[in-house]
Amino acid sequence: YMHLGLTSSDVLDTTLAIQLKESARLIIKELVSFRDAVKEQAFLHKNLPTIGRSHGIHAEPLTFGLKLAVWYEETCRNLERLKRAKDRVAYGQISGAVGTFSNVDPSIEEYVCKKLGLKPAPVSTQIVQRDRHAEFFTTLAIVAGSIDKFATEIRHLQRTEVLEAEEFFSRGQKG
C-alpha cells in the first residue's frame, strides 16, 4: 500500500531532490569557507608584487593580492550560481504515473514536499523535468572548473623555476 497510486519516479525523483539539495548545502558551506580564506589572503598580500603572465610569458607586474581577489570574485559568482541551482533542483512530485494525479490527491504532493523541505513541481509528467538536474550538474562543473584552475595555478607557482608560492613544511615533514 505504500506505493499505491504512485510511480517509482514520485519516490526516486523526490529523494534525488533531497540528496542534491543537501549536497549543495554542504558544498556551499565549504565554498564560503574557501571564499573567506581567499579574501583574507588577498588583503594580506595586496601589496606583494608578482609578475603577471600572458600565456605563461612574463607580461606586467601585479600583486599576489590582486590574483587572489580575482579568485575571490569568481568564487562569489560560483556561490550565487550554486545557491540558484540548489533552489531550482529542490522540487519533488507525488503525482502518479503520468503526472495527472489520477490516483493521488494534489494535496498529498503539497504536504509531502513541504514536510521534506521541497517545492512541488508546478507541472510534471512521470518525472521531474531533467533540465533542473542538468542546471545543477552544470553548475557543479563550473565550480569544479574554477577549483581546478586555482589548483593548477598554485601548482605552477610552486614549480622550481617559478617558486612564487611555497607549501609550508613543518619540521620532519617529507614530500
Question: Where are each of the predicted segments found?
Answer:
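A helix-coil-helix interface module used to build multimeric assemblies
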Residues: 1-95, 101, 105-111, 120, ...
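Generic secretory/membrane-interface signal
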Residues: 4-7, 113, 123, 147, ...
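Intrinsically disordered or highly flexible coil/loop and linker segments, enriched in small
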Residues: 40, 44-47, 88, 121-122, ...
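Glycine-rich anion/phosphate-binding loop at the beta-strand->alpha-helix junction
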Residues: 78, 82, 126-175
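A short, charged helix-loop
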Residues: 111-127
